[in-house]
Each structure stands twice: as structure tokens, then as C-alpha cells.
């Protein structure tokens, strides 16, 4: 398995393309100059395209991915109704979902043969919308509205329209600020990192009809932490055994172990990391974690070690200015 790591650096308007080898070392293979401040990125389900959101002219750009080395070639673009904060796709590669924090909306862009061709739906009134996360069964879109302490739930119709479910939302504790999410591989649990109190909620998906319950909330910060909470990102290993979340104020990654059924998180440790870690990701083998420091302008690679999933630093690399997003593609 070959793996390519993409790093988005909005301040220098670049995507750095790296080869990740089996020992966890990175080799730079391409630097792409992007026509705008590039932030969120996602790889298409068929691994043929990288979709990126840019500002200040709000667009989604599609880059064709070379199958041999992961190199990028511009392919298409489509306008967006707000500044892109987070970007994702459905599992069949029919739609791109874009959450906009500043516009307070989530939009759906239709794809034709992998290329974006236009917005088909927009839902407004999502104050602080920070991500859009399709459920493993491709039915439900989870959309955290950070400033409203709620996660809105939509059914995605065949033509890409978003229909509010019943119930239409679940709520967090006041002041939590739900931000980014991941799902357990067994499809029974979801995990949401809360920006404003640096906690992680565990949501049990009791059935496919919106019967959802928060079964655990865990503080992700050290006991002696007294500064402002500012959590950012969350990811889980492919085997579902280890979960990670980062905080930008403390510049650390919190390490969690996950119970076999996915219902319980246990805090295992803390990894000091790059200054202001805005984004990170786990590779497809589950062996490595790559994190970007928004203020350090570097990325670090860690090996995931042992039963606890603790992090052992493997290497550190300079990238563009203000790196914010990390995507790993296997090909």
C-alpha cells in the first residue's frame, strides 16, 4: 500500500504533497500553488480526486490524483455559498458537503463523474457550523452548530437535498461547542470533540431513525490545565482501538483507548506537539499520526505504539505557512 499525505497551508496558499513510507518517513513530492487560501480537504471515495475549500472567493476545487504517486492536477471548481470551514463527501461520491462557520450554513454540491457542478441545497441558521459528517450507512448527515451547542441531523435525499430528521437535533451541555466528529468502525458509536470546553462526547446510535444518546463525556485536558479551552480536531484508528483529539491552547494531543464495543473512552496520556495544532490525521495502516502546527509552520509524524496507543515522534518537517489540514490517501 502506497500512502500520500496532503497538507493545506492557507497563509502561503499551498498544498504540500508527501509520500509516507512504511517506516513513517515523509518525502516531499510536489508543492501545489492554490488560487486562494486553502483550508479543508477531503479525498473522494474512489480516491481519484482531492476536494479542497478555498477563500476569500468561496469555492470548492477538485484536483485529479495521479494513481502512481498521488500528484495533483487541477480539474474543476464550483462556487460555494459561504466560507468553507469543513468539507466531506457521501460514501458513494455523489455529493460534497461543506460547513461554513462564518455563514452559518451547510451546503450540498453535486458531483458528476467526480467533478463539482453546482450547489443543490443550502441549510441556513446553523450558527457556528463547523463540520458535516455523513453516517456510515450514508443516510444521516450530522452537522455540529458550535455556537448553538447542538448537532443537527438531516436525511440526505437521492437528489442531494437535506431533510430534517425527527428529532431534528441532539444537544450538548451548554457552552461545549461541538466541532468535529468521527464514527467507530462498528457503526454503533460517534465521537464529537467540543471546542469550547475541550471535551469529547460519545454518542450511541441506537437505530437508524434518529434514536441517539450521549453515553459518555470525557474531559480531554490535564488536571492542572486552567487556560482557555480551544479543542480542534478528532480522529480514530481504522481498527477503532485508539482515538485522538487535539487542543490548540495547550498544543497537545490527548490519547484515548476505546473499549471493544466502542462505548467507553479511557484517557491514556498526553502528547506535547506542534504549536497550535489545528488539524491532524491517522494513516490508513493505523500505525502513524500526522499533525500540523498552525503557528509552528511544521508537521510532525508520530508512531502509534502499544496497547495504549501512545505517540512516539518519528520526524518533523517544514511545510507552508499556517498549515491547517491533513489528509492521508492510500493507493
UniProtKB/Swiss-Prot annotation:
It comes from the Bacteria. Its EC number is 3.1.1.31. SUPFAM superfamilies: Nitrous oxide reductase, N-terminal domain (SSF50974). The modification N6-acetyllysine is found at residue 287. It is an enzyme of class 3 (hydrolase). InterPro entries: 6-phosphogluconolactonase_YbhE (IPR022528), Cycloisomerase_2 (IPR050282), Lactonase_7-beta_prop (IPR019405), N2O_reductase_N (IPR011045), WD40/YVTN_repeat-like_dom_sf (IPR015943). One of its GO terms (molecular function) is 6-phosphogluconolactonase activity. Pathway: Carbohydrate degradation; pentose phosphate pathway; D-ribulose 5-phosphate from D-glucose 6-phosphate (oxidative stage): step 2/3. The keyword Hydrolase applies. It catalyses: 6-phospho-D-glucono-1,5-lactone + H2O = 6-phospho-D-gluconate + H(+). Gene3D superfamilies: YVTN repeat-like/Quinoprotein amine dehydrogenase. GO terms for biological process: glucose metabolic process; pentose-phosphate shunt, oxidative branch. Keywords: Acetylation, Carbohydrate metabolism, Glucose metabolism, Hydrolase. One of its GO terms (cellular component) is cytosol. NCBIfam families: PRK11028.1. PANTHER family: 6-PHOSPHOGLUCONOLACTONASE, 6-PHOSPHOGLUCONOLACTONASE-RELATED. Belongs to the cycloisomerase 2 family. Catalyzes the hydrolysis of 6-phosphogluconolactone to 6-phosphogluconate. This is 6-phosphogluconolactonase. It comes from Shigella sonnei (strain Ss046). The gene is pgl.
Amino acid at each position: 500500500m502506497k500512502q500520500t499525505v496532503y497538507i493545506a497551508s492557507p497563509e502561503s496558499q499551498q498544498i504540500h504533497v508527501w509520500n509516507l513510507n512504511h517506516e513513517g518517513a515523509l518525502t516531499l513530492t510536489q508543492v501545489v500553488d492554490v488560487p486562494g487560501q486553502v483550508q479543508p480537504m477531503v479525498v473522494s471515495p474512489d480516491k481519484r480526486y482531492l476536494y479542497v475549500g478555498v477563500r476569500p472567493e468561496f469555492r470548492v476545487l477538485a484536483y485529479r490524483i495521479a494513481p502512481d504517486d498521488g500528484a495533483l492536477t487541477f480539474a474543476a471548481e464550483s462556487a460555494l455559498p459561504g466560507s468553507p470551514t469543513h468539507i466531506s463527501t457521501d460514501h458513494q461520491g455523489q455529493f460534497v458537503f461543506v460547513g461554513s462557520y462564518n455563514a452559518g450554513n451547510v451546503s450540498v454540491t453535486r458531483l458528476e463523474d467526480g467533478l463539482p457542478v453546482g450547489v443543490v441545497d443550502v441549510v441556513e441558521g446553523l450558527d457556528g457550523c463547523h463540520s458535516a459528517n455523513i453516517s456510515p450507512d450514508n443516510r444521516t448527515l450530522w452537522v455540529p452548530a458550535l455556537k448553538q451547542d447542538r448537532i443537527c441531523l438531516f436525511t440526505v435525499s437521492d437528489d442531494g437535498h437535506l431533510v430534517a430528521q425527527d428529532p431534528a437535533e441532539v444537544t450538548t451541555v451548554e457552552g461545549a461547542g461541538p466541532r468535529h466528529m468521527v464514527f467507530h468502525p462498528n457503526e454503533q458509536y460517534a465521537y464529537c470533540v467540543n471546542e469550547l470546553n475541550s471535551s469529547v462526547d460519545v454518542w450511541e446510535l441506537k437505530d437508524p431513525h434518529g434514536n441517539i444518546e450521549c453515553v459518555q463525556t470525557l474531559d480531554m485536558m490535564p488536571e492542572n490545565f486552567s487556560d482557555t479551552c480551544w479543542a480542534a480536531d478528532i480522529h480514530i484508528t481504522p481498527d477503532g482501538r485508539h482515538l485522538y483529539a487535539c487542543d490548540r491552547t495547550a498544543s497537545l494531543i490527548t490519547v484515548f483507548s476505546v473499549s471493544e464495543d466502542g462505548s467507553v473512552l479511557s484517557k491514556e496520556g498526553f502528547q506535547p506537539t506542534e504549536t497550535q495544532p489545528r488539524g491532524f490525521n491517522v494513516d490508513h495502516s493505523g500505525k502513524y499520526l500526522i499533525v500540523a502546527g498552525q503557528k509552528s509552520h511544521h508537521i510532525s509524524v508520530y508512531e502509534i505504539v502499544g496497547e495504549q496507543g501512545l505517540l512516539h515522534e518519528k520526524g518533523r518537517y517544514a511545510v507552508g505557512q499556517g498549515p491547517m489540514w491533513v489528509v492521508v490517501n492510500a493507493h
